[in-house]
């Protein structure tokens, strides 16, 4: 497998996507996919607190739980680069923290919840799933403000800085950041 170094983190050029684990794939199938990826030199996997897709309150967090169970069983945490994401403002996800936001309290809680499900004490790449600003979601054109004021980017970044300083995350990112 080709390995690329990004900001000091060595990652395989192929990333194992996990968004169907817990909805379209069972835990056993997820573990088979992780075994296969590891056997073929893939060391990078992407997940999110809202997974699996299609997102529902009943299945939320299952993907991270499946990963955590596999890591606990196999003891291979150090061999993997794990990326996960916090869910920002979206009325469809009101079952997360009574309406997820990218404010300090929600980011810190989301990270702690992901760490618990992943059964690890750090996340290699912690991303905001969508920015807390107008953006297209799932191909939506335009943007409708849903009432709540958006969290200032500075507050989001300071919360991420706190997580980094505490050793809970190594790097930060933004998923779906296209305006």
What is each stretch, according to the model?
Residues 19-21, 50, 85-89, 128-131, ...:
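Active-site beta-loop-alpha junctions enriched in small/polar residues
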Residues 94-179:
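Glycine/proline-rich, positively charged
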Residues 79, 83, 90-91, 96-98:
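Surface-exposed, interaction-prone regions with an acidic/low-complexity signature
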């Amino acid at each position: 497998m080709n390995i690329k170094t990004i900001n000091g983190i060595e990652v395989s050029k192929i990333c194992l996507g996990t968004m169907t684990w817990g909805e379209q794939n069972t835990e056993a199938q997820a573990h088979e996919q992780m075994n296969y990826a590891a056997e073929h030199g893939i060391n990078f996997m992407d997940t999110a607190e809202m997974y699996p897709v299609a997102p529902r309150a009943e299945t939320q967090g299952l993907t991270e739980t499946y990963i955590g169970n596999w890591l606990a069983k196999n003891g291979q945490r150090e061999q993997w680069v794990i990326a996960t994401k916090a869910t920002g403002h979206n009325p469809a996800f009101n079952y997360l923290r009574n309406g997820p936001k990218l404010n300090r309290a929600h980011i810190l809680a989301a990270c702690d919840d992901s760490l618990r499900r992943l059964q690890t004490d750090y996340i290699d790449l912690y991303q905001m799933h969508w920015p807390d600003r107008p953006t297209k979601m799932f191909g939506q054109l335009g943007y409708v403000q849903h009432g709540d004021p958006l969290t200032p980017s500075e507050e989001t970044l300071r919360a991420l800085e706190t997580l980094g300083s505490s050793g809970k995350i190594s790097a930060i990112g933004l998923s779906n950041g296209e305006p």
